């Protein structure tokens, strides 16, 4: 069985991500320090809360440098995806810088609520193993106030008062702005695709 490291980033979604993986036949290893990453074939970075708090927690756990050196597939979920980028407007905080781009606050408008909360459509942009067998018009469940504008690494977008990156992949570095663990069959398929993607 593939060794999956699930980083305890302090978010409320940790248990639901673990349960989603268990439904796929995977018992993840909860990780609180660098030693926990040893031998992992896949790494998952979930996150709920604020970017400054999450980066401080990763620093306190001694996980920033190990994540920067990581060679195996990594996926960030929700805030975890935002942390993969260079900088977040939330608290004006530097992030991991594993992917080029900056996290911006969503702009509210009369018909656009922030936070963006609920089901919304995934709009594929280019081929990616993460999207294998995900049907056209699939929806995912979002809860966020910040997002990454479209980048060259984006493989799917979402429209909420403007387009933003919903799924990102650059080599083995991946992210989902939505919550796959709360996105029914679509989310389960994307998690399975991540677990099964080529590690090279």
Curated annotation (Swiss-Prot):
Its main location: cytoplasm. Residues 3-200 form the Glutamine amidotransferase type-1 domain. Pfam families: GATase. The active site is at 78 (nucleophile), 179, 181. Pathway: Amino-acid biosynthesis; L-histidine biosynthesis; L-histidine from 5-phospho-alpha-D-ribose 1-diphosphate: step 5/9. Keywords: Amino-acid biosynthesis, Cytoplasm, Glutamine amidotransferase, Histidine biosynthesis, Hydrolase, Lyase. InterPro entries: Class_I_gatase-like, GATASE, Imidazole-glycPsynth_HisH. GO terms for molecular function: glutaminase activity; imidazoleglycerol-phosphate synthase activity; lyase activity. It catalyses: 5-[(5-phospho-1-deoxy-D-ribulos-1-ylimino)methylamino]-1-(5-phospho-beta-D-ribosyl)imidazole-4-carboxamide + L-glutamine = D-erythro-1-(imidazol-4-yl)glycerol 3-phosphate + 5-amino-1-(5-phospho-beta-D-ribosyl)imidazole-4-carboxamide + L-glutamate + H(+); L-glutamine + H2O = L-glutamate + NH4(+). GO terms for biological process: L-histidine biosynthetic process. GO terms for cellular component: cytoplasm. The keyword Amino-acid biosynthesis applies. SUPFAM superfamilies: Class I glutamine amidotransferase-like. It is found in: Cytoplasm. NCBIfam families: IMP_synth_hisH. IGPS catalyzes the conversion of PRFAR and glutamine to IGP, AICAR and glutamate. The HisH subunit catalyzes the hydrolysis of glutamine to glutamate and ammonia as part of the synthesis of IGP and AICAR. The resulting ammonia molecule is channeled to the active site of HisF. This is Imidazole glycerol phosphate synthase subunit HisH. It comes from Xylella fastidiosa (strain Temecula1 / ATCC 700964).
